[in-house]
């Protein structure tokens, strides 16, 4: 790890299932970035302390997944999207403050558009099954 290398992580509990490091480190290598993407298994009772000191752990940002998204919203400065969904899944520092957003809805809709183009034409009602960020 270089002196100026950037580190980002996915924070989950458990975290072993996450393929995020594999995916992100592939693209980091492809673009020859001096960065690393790691996995952090943080239990719910330790999450507030970990997030409050994210920078002290060497991170410039993080992706958040189950079961921490709602807590992340409360511990950061969320944008409108995160507030609307009630959960945060992407964190970064700006002006030394930890900010957050939510990309679940955007990702859900992008996948729906890719699989079923025009799905929303003439649509007035829809049923979304689930309780995650995409369903909100």
Residue ranges and their predicted role:
Residues 9, 127-129:
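Conserved beta-strand elements of the Class I
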Residues 103-104, 124-126:
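Short, glycine-/small-residue-rich phosphate/pyrophosphate-handling segment
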Residues 135-136:
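N-terminal Rossmann-fold NAD(P) dinucleotide-binding loop
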Residues 13, 130-132:
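Glycine-rich Rossmann-fold phosphate-binding loop(s) that bind the pyrophosphate
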Residues 2-118:
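Phosphate/diphosphate ligand-binding glycine-rich loop within oxidoreductases
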Residues 5, 122-125:
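Phosphate-coordination loops involved in phosphoryl transfer and adenosine-cofactor binding
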């Amino acid at each position: 790890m270089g002196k100026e290398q950037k580190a980002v992580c996915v924070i989950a509990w458990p975290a072993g299932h996450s393929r995020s490091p594999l995916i992100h480190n592939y693209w980091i290598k492809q673009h020859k970035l001096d960065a690393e993407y790691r996995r952090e298994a943080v239990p719910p009772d330790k999450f507030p302390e970990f997030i409050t000191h994210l920078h002290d752990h060497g991170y410039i940002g993080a992706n958040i997944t189950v079961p921490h998204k709602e807590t992340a919203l409360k511990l950061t400065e969320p944008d409108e999207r995160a507030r609307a969904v009630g959960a945060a899944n992407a964190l970064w520092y700006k002006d030394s403050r930890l900010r957050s957003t939510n990309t679940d809805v955007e990702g859900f809709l992008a996948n729906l558009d890719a699989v079923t183009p025009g799905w929303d034409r003439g649509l007035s009602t829809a049923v979304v099954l689930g309780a995650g960020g995409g369903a909100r």
